[in-house]
Amino acid sequence: MSEQDKKQAAIKAAQAAADAVREAQAALAEEGRLLFKKSWIFIRGVPSMKFLPPEGPVEIAFAGRSNVGKSSLINALVGKKGLARTSNTPGRTQELNYFVPDGYSGENGDLPPLALVDMPGYGFAEAPKAQVDAWTRLVFDYLRGRTTLKRVYVLIDARHGIKKNDAEVLDLLDKAAVSYQIVLTKIDKIKPAGVPRLLEETHKLTYKRAACFPGIIATSSEKGQGLDDLRAAIALLLKEY
């Protein structure tokens, strides 16, 4: 085979590999779209560990500072305004709130493939200190001890980056060996020119962490940015279980 033929063969192989990657990405995007096209419902709020539902479907949780946009992201993800209650008052979510696709009885193996868990925010709340401390214990106990929890999406406000209490939660997840991935919220609130730098800075702060799943997903609940990427990431996760 001549050198020219070798080059052409290498180019064709690279093109075939790129096509295969694109096809796989498109398939995941479609799986994510179909999963979240279903009607989703709220099933329970959990004020303490003893009220957790029986372990069954894969659970993914959304963690983050108060007012980072967890509830808004869940609503945008499932395409259902008002499913997760939102508020401009930090600390509005006071329980572990469970959401699942509708149409499953929950009995005799008729379980949904996935449960979304909206967690109380950390860092600030307009509530008595004792109540805030109780929420904090609930969050940490859940993160450490729930065997069906397969991924935590740690939401970071794009305008502020990773703060001290975010890093403390990442430390906890690393120590507990709970897989997590960073999701930037409100990406539309910063200038587009600043996004690459933000992604680079966030990557530098997280890529060496033991339990951090690679890849940072930048989202906007208001504009819909990054939602397809997040749905595809969840679809990929479900393939493992």
Swiss-Prot record:
One of its GO terms (cellular component) is cytosol. Necessary for normal cell division and for the maintenance of normal septation. Residues 56-240 form the EngB-type G domain. Keywords: Cell cycle, Cell division, GTP-binding, Magnesium, Metal-binding, Nucleotide-binding, Septation. The gene is engB. This is Probable GTP-binding protein EngB. InterPro entries: G_ENGB_dom, GTP-bd, GTP-bd_ribosome_bio_YsxC, P-loop_NTPase. Its cofactor is Mg(2+). Belongs to the TRAFAC class TrmE-Era-EngA-EngB-Septin-like GTPase superfamily. EngB GTPase family. GO terms for molecular function: GTP binding; metal ion binding. GTP binds at residues 64-71, 91-95, 118-121, 185-188, 219-221. Mg(2+) binds at S71, T93. PROSITE patterns: G_ENGB. GO terms for biological process: division septum assembly.
